[in-house]
Amino acid sequence: METEADTAKTFWSEVDVDGVFDELMEVLRRLRHTLRHNTATDREYVQAMRIVQESKLIRTETEDVLLDEDILTVTVSEPQCSPESLQNGIEPEDPQHSTARLYSDVGVVCSHMSSSRPDPAAPLVFQPHVCSSACVPHLPAHTHHLLGHNPLRAPLLCHFQRVCDDAGVVYKAPCGRSLSCMQEVLHFLLQTQSVCVLQTDRFSFSTQVCVERQVCAAPLLERDLSRGLEPVPVALVNTVDGARPREFRYRRERWPHGCFLSAEPLYSVCCDCTDGCTDAHSCACVRRTAGAAYTHQRLTHTLRTGLFECGPWCGCERSRCENRVVQKGLRVRLQVFRTPEHMWAVRCRDDLDAGTFICIYAGVVLRLQQSSECPAERSGEPAVSDDEVQLVEEWRIPEETHTHTHTLDSSPPLHVPVIQRPAEHSLAQRRDQQQFSISSETEDNRCEQALRKKPRLMESNGLQDSRTHTLTHTHDGVYYLDASREGNVARFFTHSDDPNLFIQNVFTDTHDPQFPLIAFFTCRPVKAGTELTWSCTNTEQQKTEEKHCSV
């Protein structure tokens, strides 16, 4: 009969000891942080108390910590846990890691600690009163304290209740007030001065969304693929084989920024709203989008005019502004994973409501010079394979009459010249590419490669002549985003004929119509663990825009 010691030896022989203890230290650091800032949930209070009580502060080396009927064996040694370390912090964090890592995935052994949730509370009874900041007593000092959690669980962490039944979804505020729609939520957040921390996109009234559902835990190849660049860690898992993605430089944003690309004035309008930029008539930035903007920081369909967010020169209060979404960056929890077909893809770790912003498509902006004839292939150079451009999208500029005059109130044409994402290469190709350093390749070489790819991009569409003519006479050249060597998590998004994401052109760092940000939004509710996909040939956009894809 196998003894407990034998079981323990087998357990530790099958896991990464350093990785497990790194995760455990992050759990302890997170608990310490929430306790010090009075943002801990009831469950976290109990967890922290049991850890300290059961460890007996180094009087025994191995103790059992009870967590929800599960026994977790924790080895506590003197240099790792002492009264001084508990008082001053566990250990200094690596400077290259952001504070968002404190809330990162805690792996297999500590997964039930990372997914802490408040115990179900008794029904809240409402007593008539005028709401104030005292109605949300457990509100953290800053929204950053909620990073790393499921965004839709943020109200629950602040002791709200979400009641879902056949009649719909109702939120119960800590003071007992019922909130049955987004307008009531926004009014309550403004009344209680909590809108700076709990914004409207943290609430969901969709009955298809379960805020407690999350993807099953899996061994992590890397806790944060962005290595601290993203506000929320991007996990990397592979349960199929031992492969890792091709080496690339993670970029949180596109490069160069719009301020370095545009030769025109950066911003055509600015606003100084005091109402959160919710009025399309009074907010100049929302009016620039022809009055169609976010609905409580969500976007459910594509806006052909592009979407103009409030910029750095606007006088509106950023924490209250409802017209700043994309510029906040990644907020949802994503996971890059290996598919059974040995391809890389991305899935959401939590349920997502329709219209949720996911991330932008980051990469390096390159330019295709327009010329009458294509550059010839150099002798001795391999031809560019179609596989090197796995997914390309080009948006045709809407035709305009010669009498049309461009004003500040008019909206620029939607223009996404080319989006290029990396393709899966053969093992031999990967070995060849790994011999070259990313930093050693100059911008001239990249542009040269882009020029060689240009004929293949254009020839896949029958509208090549008219499209090229339009672009040549409207802009100096065609620009495209290259994420083959530098990009973000969006480079792993896959194509689907039935996508759950759509693309929206958003202007944040410039109003130049040539340089929008390419943002991804959910087009319907998405369950936790679902692969995130997008398409350049979906039916709805085909009705309004001419596009072509090359696969």
UniProtKB/Swiss-Prot annotation:
Residues 426-447 are annotated as: Disordered. The gene is setdb2. It is an enzyme of class 2 (transferase). This is Histone-lysine N-methyltransferase SETDB2. Zn(2+) 1 binds at C271, C273, C277, C283. One of its GO terms (cellular component) is nucleus. PANTHER family: HISTONE-LYSINE N-METHYLTRANSFERASE EGGLESS, HISTONE-LYSINE N-METHYLTRANSFERASE SETDB2. Pfam families: MBD (PF01429), Pre-SET (PF05033), SET (PF00856). S-adenosyl-L-methionine binds at H342, M343, W344, R491, T494, H495. Residues 146-210 form the MBD domain. InterPro entries: DNA-bd_dom_sf (IPR016177), Methyl_CpG_DNA-bd (IPR001739), Pre-SET_dom (IPR007728), SET_dom (IPR001214), SET_dom_sf (IPR046341), SETDB_methyltransferase (IPR051516). Zn(2+) 3 binds at C277, C310, C316, C321. Residues 269-329 form the Pre-SET domain.
